[in-house]
Amino acid sequence: MKKADAAARARDLRERIRAADHAYYVLDQPVLADAEYDRLMHELQAIEAEHPELVTADSPTQRVSGAPSERFERVVHREPMLSLGNVQSDDELHEFDARVRRLLGLPEGEAVGYVVEPKLDGLAVELVYRDGAFTGGSTRGDGVNGEDVTANLRVVGGLGANRGVPHALEGTPPPRVEVRGEVLLFKEHFEAMNRQLVRAGDEPFANPRNAAAGTLRQLDWRVTARRPLSFVAYEALVPGGDPWRTHWEKLEALAAWGFETNPENRRCRGLGEVLAYRDRMAERRFELPYDTDGIVVKVDDLDWRRRLGAASKFPRWAVAFKYPPQEEATRIRRIWASVGRTGVLTPVVDFDPVRLSGAMVARATLHNEDEMRRKDILEGDWVLVRRAGEVIPEVVKPLPERRTGEERPFRFPAECPVCGARVVREEGEKVYRCTGAACPAQLVGRICHFAQRRALDIEGLGEKLAAGLVERGQVKDFADLYAVPFEVWQQLFSRPRKEQDAGAARELPEKSAQNMVAALERSRSTTLRRFLFALGIPQVGEATAATLARHFGDLARILDADEEALKGVRDVGPETASEIRAWTQEPQNRRVVERLLAAGVRPEPEVVEARGPFAGKTVVLTGGLSAMSRDDAKAEVERRGGKVSGSVSRKTDLVVAGEEAGSKLEKARSLGVRVVGEEEFVRLLKE
């Protein structure tokens, strides 16, 4: 692959992986199957291995996924909470073992001692104990910074699940110890909670992982307290050095202090015993009381671990082996088209319910017509289905040998199934679109986009409420949200919907309506970049919205900018400029913006402090930063009146060099440009 093509493909892969990371870790709503995610990650790793000069410090291959939510205080981990590299074959496990032996310089024939354990599917957290007392806890977040969920962790296990977070440790623990483990829902507790939801007429959770993650990240700890979360410990860290020789001794200490550890943990001598353990657990995986999609293999000797160290994202002394997804045969009942906020029709497959990875599944989506044709899927087919990554239902392939001749290919409708408008597939596009400007399904999708956390952040306004508003004719565009009568909100909240708490009395409709009105009032005060993103302008994502806001600084200037002015904005190409211009010149769109402003929505530009050491300076960031992401560092510089450039030249005023800084650092030194490390950079930000 040519370098230019490789660079473009790498950029595309990074964006797709970051979007999937955000959906999985921050929104708790996976959008990619694990196999597809792993395929994208492996492709990006291969490109970066072939072209090392294309590696960026903020590449997903260099960092742990999962940025902290803005709803919680940020906590800096004393030692990074790294994620694990994963393998899926015996060959890859052999490569891992060979690499460990090579790095340790072990003689031929000397076996490595490992600890193996089931890979738990929950939310990784860290607990801090001082003098035996629990003093704080956080999620993993991006590995460097997590979310402070102390209040919620205090009540994990409060329902007598016998797998909770101890408030005080037993025995004689060190003066300070950091305990890491997984918060999860055991199958029996998950099923009981879903039964309560169904009895109440509400929507059950899709899987235990989503339920556990959503419960732990509740703003109200009382919601967490009424749900049967459990905690299983698998790591302990002591400042100044661990007092143990092996990981197994750590696990024994954790159990002695009162923590639940996994009874399936085993010590293995050499890779042969690891493979035997893997095979036994694969046979028993669905009999276990919790969801698991693989095993974790860790070097047992702690001195060897220190010698092996870690790469930027993964420890070299551990790896996760992931099982292939469970597959079941079922018969397709029907294929139909759903309509999204941009008018795209997505084929949806309904099939006879089957149990997969502990959950009943009856529906999956196909991306587009091309995928359906490629897989040769017909209405009435028997098909193999799976929950890819144990989460997302997926149709794997048809079983043509079971066809009777009655199966029929699915044809996309000529008219929108929701509004009746014409459906088209433009030349060069893979999707069919509804052309109806007033399509209710599109409107529901646009409202959800407008209200999401990264846009105007209207807390509590999701798809069900949006659909209810559209059904009642209360909302024709975003501005109508601010004119919905209080009584209508009460009526909507009186209908069955997923409660904040499955075990408690339903919140009164009046209180819920008051909360919604308050959320709408808060959303009136927003930033220009959030407002632009919320409008759903084609090709204007978060990054482009932020760039436009910084460049123009004023909504009116953006609305009046012609294509030439828009093409002058960094990272805005001709196609994007054309899309923005077309949107801003559409009279209906202008009316919506005017009505939003009349409703009191005030999109303010972020204040740029044109003073201090960065004011008017050109700054280049190179290498990895531990205190913040590359995007955060860039935003901090720009907020202080500086400009961040991607290359070093004689016009560069300052280079910030993080870990593993490369050619940019060398060029800066050759040109005599001032270079500072991360510590000095953080100090300058505080000036």
Curated annotation (Swiss-Prot):
SMART domains: BRCT, HhH1, LIGANc. NCBIfam families: dnlj, PRK07956.1. Its EC number is 6.5.1.2. It comes from Anaeromyxobacter dehalogenans (strain 2CP-C). This is DNA ligase. Keywords: DNA damage, DNA repair, DNA replication, Ligase, Magnesium, Manganese, Metal-binding, NAD, Zinc. Disulfide bonds: none annotated. Belongs to the NAD-dependent DNA ligase family. LigA subfamily. One of its GO terms (cellular component) is cytosol. One of its GO terms (biological process) is DNA repair. Residues 609-687 form the BRCT domain. It is an enzyme of class 6 (ligase). InterPro entries: BRCT_dom (IPR001357), BRCT_dom_sf (IPR036420), DisA/LigA_HHH (IPR041663), DNA_ligase (IPR001679), DNA_ligase_AS (IPR018239), DNA_ligase_CS (IPR033136), DNAligase_adenylation (IPR013839), DNAligase_N (IPR013840). DNA ligase that catalyzes the formation of phosphodiester linkages between 5'-phosphoryl and 3'-hydroxyl groups in double-stranded DNA using NAD as a coenzyme and as the energy source for the reaction. It is essential for DNA replication and repair of damaged DNA. NAD(+) binds at D34, A35, E36, Y37, D38, S83, L84, E117, R140, E182, K298, K322. It catalyses: NAD(+) + (deoxyribonucleotide)n-3'-hydroxyl + 5'-phospho-(deoxyribonucleotide)m = (deoxyribonucleotide)n+m + AMP + beta-nicotinamide D-nucleotide. The active site is at K119 (n6-amp-lysine intermediate). Pfam families: BRCT, DNA_ligase_aden, DNA_ligase_OB, DNA_ligase_ZBD, HHH_2, Nlig-Ia. Zn(2+) binds at C416, C419, C434, C439. Its cofactor is Mg(2+); Mn(2+). One of its GO terms (molecular function) is DNA binding. PANTHER family: CHROMOSOME TRANSMISSION FIDELITY FACTOR 18 (PTHR23389), DNA LIGASE (PTHR23389:SF9).
